[in-house]
Amino acid sequence: MNDISTVNKLAERIGGSSCSTSCGDGEGSLQVALDPHIKITGAKVFAVYGKGGIGKSTTSSNLSAAFSRLGKRVLQICRDRGADATI
């Protein structure tokens, strides 16, 4: 999703804002905010798998970092031998 106009359209649809080079996350970054009315209780488990090279580790790492910044406790386990999610 490198097309900036596509990112802008997606951001408008989900109520976020897109960034160009003005955001710290880089060009094409999509910023969303957690709805304060939504209460997350209990553990949530997400499994991501599929074809190689499509951004699974990148997406998982970015989601983990975002939830952590929101004050959520996050445990990310990566079984990829390439260790792409290693920080």
Curated annotation (Swiss-Prot):
GO terms for molecular function: ATP binding; metal ion binding; oxidoreductase activity. ATP binds at G53, I54, G55, K56, S57, T58. The keyword ATP-binding applies. Pfam families: Fer4_NifH (PF00142). Its cofactor is [4Fe-4S] cluster. Binds 1 [4Fe-4S] cluster per dimer. SUPFAM superfamilies: P-loop containing nucleoside triphosphate hydrolases. The keyword Membrane does not apply. Mg(2+) binds at S57. It catalyses: chlorophyllide a + oxidized 2[4Fe-4S]-[ferredoxin] + 2 ADP + 2 phosphate = protochlorophyllide a + reduced 2[4Fe-4S]-[ferredoxin] + 2 ATP + 2 H2O. Belongs to the NifH/BchL/ChlL family. PANTHER family: LIGHT-INDEPENDENT PROTOCHLOROPHYLLIDE REDUCTASE IRON-SULFUR ATP-BINDING PROTEIN (PTHR42864:SF2). Component of the dark-operative protochlorophyllide reductase (DPOR) that uses Mg-ATP and reduced ferredoxin to reduce ring D of protochlorophyllide (Pchlide) to form chlorophyllide a (Chlide). This reaction is light-independent. The L component serves as a unique electron donor to the NB-component of the complex, and binds Mg-ATP. This is Light-independent protochlorophyllide reductase iron-sulfur ATP-binding protein. It comes from Acidiphilium rubrum. The gene is bchL.
